[in-house]
UniProtKB/Swiss-Prot annotation:
The lineage of its organism: Bacteria, Thermotogati, Deinococcota, Deinococci, Deinococcales. It comes from the Bacteria. Keywords: Ribonucleoprotein, Ribosomal protein, RNA-binding, rRNA-binding. One of its GO terms (cellular component) is ribonucleoprotein complex. This is Large ribosomal subunit protein bL20. Residues 1-24 are annotated as: Disordered. Belongs to the bacterial ribosomal protein bL20 family. The keyword Transferase does not apply. It comes from Deinococcus deserti (strain DSM 17065 / CIP 109153 / LMG 22923 / VCD115). GO terms for biological process: ribosomal large subunit assembly; translation. Binds directly to 23S ribosomal RNA and is necessary for the in vitro assembly process of the 50S ribosomal subunit. It is not involved in the protein synthesizing functions of that subunit. The keyword Ribosomal protein applies. The gene is rplT. GO terms for molecular function: rRNA binding; structural constituent of ribosome.
């Protein structure tokens, strides 16, 4: 078998890494070694933050629902508990959207939660 020199393979691999490192500052986007190390760290942040994103959005939805419920004299936990008892089966994402965009519909949900006791 003939010996394969690494030139073209290395260049292709380095180009791939440097392409992914576009937008990084300074030598992190220009030099292969710095770009590679930065991409390793970026991958751990990507992995971590894909999971944190779910937590962050749920917290945002809860805050929006709580704000909407407090406008009608109720807090979040009693509102959610009342909805469960009333048999309203909407998730927090939808409830937050209704609270932000359709105040009349949210008022009806608050009334349902109050009567669901």
């Amino acid at each position: 078998m003939p010996r394969v020199k690494t030139g073209t393979v290395r260049r292709r691999r380095h180009k791939k890494v440097l392409k992914r490192a576009k937008g990084f500052e300074g030598s992190r986007s220009k030099q292969y070694r710095n770009a590679f190390q930065t991409l390793l760290n970026a991958a751990t942040y990507e992995y971590r933050d894909r999971r944190n994103k779910k937590r962050d959005f749920r917290r945002l939805w809860v805050q929006r629902i709580n704000a909407g419920a407090r406008l009608h004299g109720m807090n979040y936990s009693t509102f959610i508990g009342g909805l469960k008892r009333a048999g309203v089966d909407l998730n927090r994402k939808v409830l937050a959207d209704i609270a932000a965009r359709e105040p009349e519909a949210f008022k009806a949900l608050v009334d349902a939660a109050k009567n669901g006791k």
